[in-house]
């Protein structure tokens, strides 16, 4: 039994048995998508978010258990590990409390208190703390000698010992934490000599800023930390010093007298020199961690929405990477996304070869039977889209605007060089734009998520936590959609449950040598793909047109026999059962409940039989900007215009309204009600109507509102 399951269940308000089962599955090497989809009976129908939370809590407790081992060994080596202390450490599962217990025993550089102890002044410190001595100077004379020069040095050494004792006391530390928790203020000031630098102006909002720490939003905190890292700001966190020292003195100073005065001075020193910097650092780290976590959640959710954007599907596409002086790079792709042709046209100034460009586009559309166009949303996007929509092609061709974020990163990457070794970066970039329209998920997994541009301060947060979270999102999205085993790239297969880079490469090589897979069971012939990997991956891989229709569904091979029994009971084949919706409705799934298979799995199976291999991403929608607005100068306050949500943050959503500068809908302007999180109201790439409320031409800032629309 996992030693942490009880604590995890209590912390997450989950069934202890479900947590125990989930931890067992994780220990066996099962992936989160597999557990969530195919082990619902064991987990109590937990979704991926809950399973992830269980896994993270388990890792946290494991790390704490390791830390305890280190602490116990260190204290044991000092010969100071009493039975009572060991029990306290064994029973402690709060990281801050654990470090407080350890603090007095923690090896540290030679402190003033240690020097004083070496001088034999510990008894004097204890005497002063008792506060019964009427003449502390007289008591201190007994300690003057070879190591202590005079009474003043003796008393100072004793105060140093008291200060360290106070600073390492758990109750003292918790008192100061309480004051910081209640009233800590975060303050940001500009570094005077850098105030007029151009780059510093990005942080002008924080040149003289202060706010209660508990009310400071993650984006403001990260902005200040970025300004501090760049050398433009000084950021500090502080509480009410007087309130802190008063609280400490109430505990340590009893009455009035010379001893009490000395102890009071030691307490002041303990707070100013030791406690205050320590707790400030602790709260700075905690606030940074909290801000990081919030920013990572925002980025992860944005990435999920981007990856799960609706695909155009397998259609012949012409991709256009628009530009002025360097022309528009075009790439024609077949229905599988293979590059069949590319060239450059110059419809815009300075070359302005509009007629030749139009003729070239008509020729390519006719020759390669283009069904849709994908235009990158960068420079000259608006002008290019309008030009293409004006061309009278021989057959209808829909024009879509596609995000270019990260396309240049992909075009120079190792993956792109391997795919197109003989093409330059401009061609690779255009191909990526076209493929994003066809299947955003399959193309975006090739790009570092941080380059996609849908987060807030993603380069400032904990990079290892960010990578872990984003990898988890990519894996979740890939497996929730499912992957075509016969067309998926090696990179896409890498994210399938149970595979990884090596098995993904082996699958592609097997496919190249042996032709397309005709059944899932063929996967067992792939080198190094053993029973465990097969169990984890099979349900997420699809084979359109397979002899067994279940091979193109999310029904796991381990449940094929169950579906065969259902079909047999109805007197039909599995294929007939899949095709006959009326027949499916006659099945009473309760008859098939067993020790291994419960209602959650049976419900999932019936949903798959109804729509096998259904892509959950929906259908792509066309969008057009307001034709009368082409530049920020065209905007007027009060205008209502269409836009596309390009980024979502904690403080609002950015919307592209076709003027080369995204406008901001602040969270307070998102609805006619209170909105705590913008993602409650909008989704990435959603088409919205917005009202212009402010236009700052100098700073190129646009304020928008969605209220009363």
Predicted segments, located by residue:
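Long, highly charged, low-complexity intrinsically disordered interaction regions
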Residues: 4, 62-80, 90, 409, ...
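Duplex nucleic acid-engaging cores and interfaces of nucleic-acid transaction enzymes
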Residues: 50-53, 60-319, 325-423, 430
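A glycine-rich phosphate-binding loop feature that marks nucleotide/adenosyl-phosphate handling sites
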Residues: 178-185, 320-324, 378-383, 402-409, ...
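Structured, non-catalytic alpha/beta "coupling" segments that mediate domain-domain communication
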Residues: 74, 88, 98-101, 227-240, ...
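Short flexible coil/turn linkers enriched for glycine and charged/polar residues
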Residues: 15-16, 28-29, 95-96, 109, ...
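Short beta-alpha junctions and helix-cap segments that line functional grooves
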Residues: 317-319, 329, 385-388, 519-522, ...
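Single-stranded RNA-binding regions, centering on S1/OB-family and related RNA-binding modules
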Residues: 543-709
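Short, ordered loop/turn segments at secondary-structure junctions
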Residues: 38-40, 129, 240, 322, ...
């Amino acid at each position: 039994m996992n030693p942490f399951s009880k604590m995890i269940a209590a912390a997450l308000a989950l069934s202890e048995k479900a947590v125990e089962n989930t931890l067992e599955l994780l220990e066996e090497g099962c992936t989160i998508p597999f557990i969530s989809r195919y082990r619902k009976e064991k987990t109590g129908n937990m979704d991926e978010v809950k399973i992830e939370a269980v896994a993270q809590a388990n890792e946290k407790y494991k790390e704490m258990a390791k830390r305890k081992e280190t602490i116990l060994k260190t204290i044991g080596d000092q010969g100071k590990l009493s039975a009572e202390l060991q029990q306290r450490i064994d029973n402690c599962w709060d990281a801050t409390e654990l470090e407080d217990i350890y603090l007095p025993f923690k090896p540290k550089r030679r402190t003033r208190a240690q020097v004083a102890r070496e001088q034999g002044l510990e008894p004097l410190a204890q005497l002063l703390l008792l506060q019964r001595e009427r003449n502390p100077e007289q008591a201190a004379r007994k300690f003057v000698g070879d190591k202590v020069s005079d009474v003043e040095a003796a008393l100072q050494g004793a105060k140093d010992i008291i200060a360290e004792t106070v600073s390492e006391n758990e109750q003292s530390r918790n008192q100061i934490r309480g004051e910081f928790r209640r009233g800590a203020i975060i303050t940001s000031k500009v570094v005077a000599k850098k105030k007029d630098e151009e780059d510093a102006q990005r942080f002008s909002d924080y040149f003289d800023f202060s706010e209660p720490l508990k009310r400071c939003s993650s984006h403001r905190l990260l902005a200040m930390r970025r300004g501090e890292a760049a050398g433009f700001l000084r950021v500090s966190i502080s509480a009410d010093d007087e309130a802190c020292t008063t609280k400490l003195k109430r505990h340590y100073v009893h009455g009035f007298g010379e001893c009490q005065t000395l102890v009071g001075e030691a307490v002041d020193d303990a707070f100013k020199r030791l406690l205050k910097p320590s707790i400030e650092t602790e709260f700075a780290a905690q606030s940074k961690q909290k801000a990081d976590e919030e920013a990572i959640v925002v980025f992860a959710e944005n990435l999920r929405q981007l990856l799960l954007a609706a695909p155009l599907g397998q259609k012949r596409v012409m991709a256009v990477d628009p530009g002025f002086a360097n022309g528009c790079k075009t790439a024609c792709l077949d229905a599988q996304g293979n590059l069949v042709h590319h060239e450059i046209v110059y419809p815009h100034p300075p070359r302005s070869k509009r007629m030749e460009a139009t003729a070239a586009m008509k020729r390519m559309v006719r020759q390669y039977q283009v069904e849709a166009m994908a235009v990158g949303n960068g420079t000259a996007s608006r002008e290019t889209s309008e030009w293409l929509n004006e061309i009278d092609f021989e057959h209808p061709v829909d024009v879509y605007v596609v995000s270019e974020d990260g396309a240049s990163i992909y075009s120079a990457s190792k993956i792109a060089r391997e795919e197109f070794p003989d093409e330059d970066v401009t061609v690779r970039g255009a191909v990526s734009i076209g493929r994003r329209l066809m299947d955003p998920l399959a193309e975006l997994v090739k790009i570092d998520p941080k380059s996609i541009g849908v987060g807030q301060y993603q380069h400032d947060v904990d990079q290892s936590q960010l990578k872990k979270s984003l990898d988890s999102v990519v894996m979740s999205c890939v497996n929730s959609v499912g992957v075509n085993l016969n067309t998926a790239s090696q990179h896409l297969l890498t994210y399938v449950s149970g595979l990884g880079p090596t098995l993904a490469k082996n699958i592609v090589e097997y496919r190249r040598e042996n032709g397309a897979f005709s059944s899932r069971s063929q996967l067992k012939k792939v080198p190094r793909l053993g029973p465990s990997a097969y169990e984890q991956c099979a349900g997420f891989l699809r084979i359109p047109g397979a002899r067994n229709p279940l091979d193109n569904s999310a029904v796991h091979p381990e449940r094929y026999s169950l579906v065969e029994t259902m079909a047999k009971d109805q007197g039909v084949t599995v294929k007939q059962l899949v095709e006959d919706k009326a027949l499916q409705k006659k099945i009473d799934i309760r008859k098939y409940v067993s020790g291994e298979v419960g209602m959650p799995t049976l419900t999932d199976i019936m949903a798959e039989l109804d729509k096998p291999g259904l892509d959950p991403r929906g259908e792509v929608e066309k969008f057009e900007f307001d034709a009368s607005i082409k530049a920020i100068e065209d905007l007027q306050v009060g205008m209502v215009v269409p836009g596309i949500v390009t980024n979502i943050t904690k403080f609002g959503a950015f919307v592209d309204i076709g003027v080369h500068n995204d406008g901001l809908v602040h969270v307070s302007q998102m609805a006619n009600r209170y909105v705590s999180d913008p993602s409650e109201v909008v989704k990435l790439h959603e088409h919205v109507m917005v009202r212009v409320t402010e236009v700052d031409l100098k700073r190129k800032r646009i304020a928008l509102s969605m209220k009363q629309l």
